[in-house]
C-alpha cells in the first residue's frame, strides 16, 4: 500500500504566501522560500503552490520564485496558477516543479487536460476542483476563478460529474478543494469525500477543513484519500508535521515517518 501524504498548501499572491477563510479575506503569512524550506525540513511529503489570482488576472503563475523553491527543498512540489498552454507547463516544469495543477483553465478548455497529459505524462498532471455545497439544493457545484472573490462564479458542472470528466481526459491526480470548509478548521467534509472517492480512480487529495490531527486521521481512515492538504494549521504552527505523522503512524496509518 502506498504511504499516505501530508501536503502543506501555500497560496501565493503578489509574491507572498497568504491565507483566507472560504477563499476570502486573505491575510499575509510570509515569504515563499523560507516557508517552503521549513515545511520540507519538518517532514512534508510534498508541497502545493497556488498563485491564486493568476487565472482571474489572465496571466500565468509568477515563475520567479519557482526555481528558488527548487533550490532549497528536496521533496516534490506542484505549481498552479493560470497554466493555459503546453508552453506554460513546460516552463514551470523546467524551473524545477515536479507537477503542474490546472483548475479554472481546465474548466474553460477541458481539452487542455488531455494535451498536457499526452505531452508530459499523467503522473505530473493534477486537476484542482473548487467545490461548494449548496445547502438549498443539496448539491455540490464546481466554482471557477476562486482566487478573486469578485470574479468567482459557479459553473454548470456538478462536482461528481466533473471528477469523472477530468479522469476521462487524463488527470493523474485530483485535489478536492472543499470551499465551505476552507480555513474554518472544523474538519474535512467526509461525506463529500466519500462520494468523490467512489467515482475517483486516481489519487485523491483532500483540501479544506483540517484543524486537528484527528481530522487528518478521519480523512485517511474514513474517506480513504491518498493525501491530505492543509494550510492554516501549518502556517500558524497549530500542528507540527513531524508530530502529526508520528500520531498517524501510531494510529496505524501507512505514512512516511521523518
UniProtKB/Swiss-Prot annotation:
Its EC number is 4.3.2.10. GO terms for biological process: L-histidine biosynthetic process. SUPFAM superfamilies: Ribulose-phoshate binding barrel (SSF51366). GO terms for molecular function: imidazoleglycerol-phosphate synthase activity; lyase activity. GO terms for cellular component: cytoplasm. The keyword Cytoplasm applies. Keywords: Amino-acid biosynthesis, Cytoplasm, Histidine biosynthesis, Lyase. It comes from the Bacteria. The keyword Amino-acid biosynthesis applies. The active site is at 11, 130. It catalyses: 5-[(5-phospho-1-deoxy-D-ribulos-1-ylimino)methylamino]-1-(5-phospho-beta-D-ribosyl)imidazole-4-carboxamide + L-glutamine = D-erythro-1-(imidazol-4-yl)glycerol 3-phosphate + 5-amino-1-(5-phospho-beta-D-ribosyl)imidazole-4-carboxamide + L-glutamate + H(+). Heterodimer of HisH and HisF. NCBIfam families: hisF. Belongs to the HisA/HisF family. IGPS catalyzes the conversion of PRFAR and glutamine to IGP, AICAR and glutamate. The HisF subunit catalyzes the cyclization activity that produces IGP and AICAR from PRFAR using the ammonia provided by the HisH subunit. HAMAP family: HisF (MF_01013). This is Imidazole glycerol phosphate synthase subunit HisF. It comes from Klebsiella pneumoniae subsp. pneumoniae (strain ATCC 700721 / MGH 78578).
